[in-house]
Amino acid sequence: IWNQVVNNQGKLTTRIYFDEMQNQFLTDNQAQFFTNLYARVRKYGAIPTGITQNVETLLARTEGRKLLSNSEFIVLLKQKKTDIAALKETISLTDALIRYIEKPKAKGTGLIIAGQTVVPFENPIPKDTELFRLVATDAYQSIE
């Protein structure tokens, strides 16, 4: 990863996606290594993106809380109550905003946090479209 970031610096923007990011915060050593890598690639012009369904695990460590609170752009979809409780300690969310991630009306509903601005969104994708087929991630969803 590091070699690619350095080779692309000043020529291309390197985007790095860390899926299941919470797995990088299971031990102190993992958390320390990952947060250093995350900061380092940002410094050299890459755009790291963390993806997790278990934000509570991420926020259980100081490094995870710092990483999230230092993020300028966050998208939150449906969250469990325990994850919401952990998020409320790190991000200022009103009860009116929490309803978009606690009990959303439909998939595709959530919050976009950009700096100090929080915008709720509802953007369900109709199931009978090519876009839905391309982005559907539910293993139990029948895709024709």
Region locations from a protein language model:
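Conserved P-loop NTPase motor cores
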Residues: I1-Y100, K127
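Conserved P-loop NTPase motor module
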Residues: I1-K11, I101-E144
